[in-house]
Regions:
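Intrinsically disordered, low-complexity proline/glycine-rich segments
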Residues: 1-172
């Protein structure tokens, strides 16, 4: 399955946009809020019901994003946590979302997602998804190509939204 996220380049106060499938049908809606100390984003279903709220943790050595069911909750649904990775221009993140674990390796314009076991070990040959930031487009565009059996669409949308929030928010 393919999900596509398209945003406007210039917005004031936040950006609301659709996440569509390969046919252009809206599957999710998202909203990013830029003028806050911490980067955050909301993910909604097509009817406008909030699925999750993502918020950056300020004091974290390699970076951390908490995923909540809604703003103000006390127990997170999931956590994106950065880890040490000695390769230049590549960052490795761990996603633990509702008991499912993934290792996410990101460069400046692409991201690879691997399913992981409880010890964060993964097989490099079995990639669950791949995100590309599409260059030379009128709108800020991300394309997530993923295997639905290894990576549920909701988690794929969360990872795509996180990739934009964590790596490309300062470009708006």
């Amino acid at each position: 399955m393919i999900l596509q996220l398209q945003q406007k380049y210039f917005t004031i106060g936040g950006d609301k946009f659709n996440i569509t499938d390969e046919n252009g049908t809206p599957v999710y809606q998202a909203k990013e809020i830029f003028f806050k100390l911490r980067g955050n984003a909301h993910l909604y279903d097509v009817q406008g019901n909030e699925i999750c709220f993502m918020e950056a943790k300020i004091l974290s050595w390699f970076g951390q994003y908490n995923i909540w069911a809604r703003e103000g909750d006390t127990t997170p649904l999931g956590i994106f946590k950065g880890t040490f990775y000695p390769v230049p221009f590549v960052k490795r993140w761990r996603l633990d979302y509702m008991g499912k674990k993934f290792v996410v390796k990101c460069g400046p314009y692409n991201c690879k997602v691997f399913p992981s076991d409880d010890n964060w070990k993964y097989d490099k040959k079995h990639m669950a998804g791949h995100i590309h930031k599409r260059l030379l487009k009128i709108r800020d565009t991300y394309k997530m190509d993923f295997d639905e059996s290894a990576l549920p669409p909701q988690i794929a949308a969360i990872i795509t939204l996180w990739f934009d929030t964590a790596f490309h928010n300062n470009q708006h």
